[in-house]
Curated annotation (Swiss-Prot):
Cofactor note: Binds 1 Mg(2+) ion per subunit.
Species per Swiss-Prot/TrEMBL record: Lactococcus lactis subsp. cremoris (strain SK11)
E.C. number: 3.1.21.10
Gene responsible for this protein: recU
Example GO BP: chromosome segregation
Keyword field: Cytoplasm, DNA damage, DNA recombination, DNA repair, Endonuclease, Hydrolase, Magnesium, Metal-binding, Nuclease
Site (Transition state stabilizer): 116
Short name of any one Pfam family annotated for the protein: RecU
Similarity comment: family membership: Belongs to the RecU family.
Protein's name according to its UniProt entry: Holliday junction resolvase RecU
Amino acid sequence: MVNYPNGRSQSYSAVPKKQKTLTELSVAKKSAPKSKSLVAFGKRGMNFEAEINATNDYYLSRGLAVIHKKPTPIQIVKVDYPQRSRAKITEAYFRQASTTDYSGVYKGHYVDFEAKETHQKTVFPLKNFHEHQIVHMSNVLAQRGIAFVLLHFADLEETYLLPSSYLITFYYEKNGLKSIPLAYIRENGYKIETNHIPRIPYLEIVNKLCEVQ
């Protein structure tokens, strides 16, 4: 059993279901209501994270970059040992990530970035970022790495790459503001025009960041 962040747990039954006959399957297929297609990002059926993962897979397959999503750390709470040589995790929880979502290498440069999404139309809430992530990105920049955030405005269907230096500056000089204005992101960031393949061509902008280092 694994406890997910929303507190729900998932278990699976090992008892096989009764096989249906061909006639039963045919009748069920005809009577089943047609389901609506899932649309979560840009009306293409993918959410923001899936778009980024697909883009990274494309870059890897073309030998352009090696960038992966960092696994979410898990806190193991209970382990059973049904046999001496075999351990079974029976209870575990997802822990809060300590750094950012993605990291890798591009043209000899270390790349590190966070990806966030909002349904707000004029601002991006700062509550989406934790101070330890801001500190981590500051440390990456101090080592001459490439650090940034990908910000997706779902309702506007707009995606921006904001260099971490601008996020860090705003985070510590926000003057009581709880959100980053979209105008600030547009002024200091780069709008990403989504494609079919790759989905989110952010390396085109990373090239520019490499040039100014």
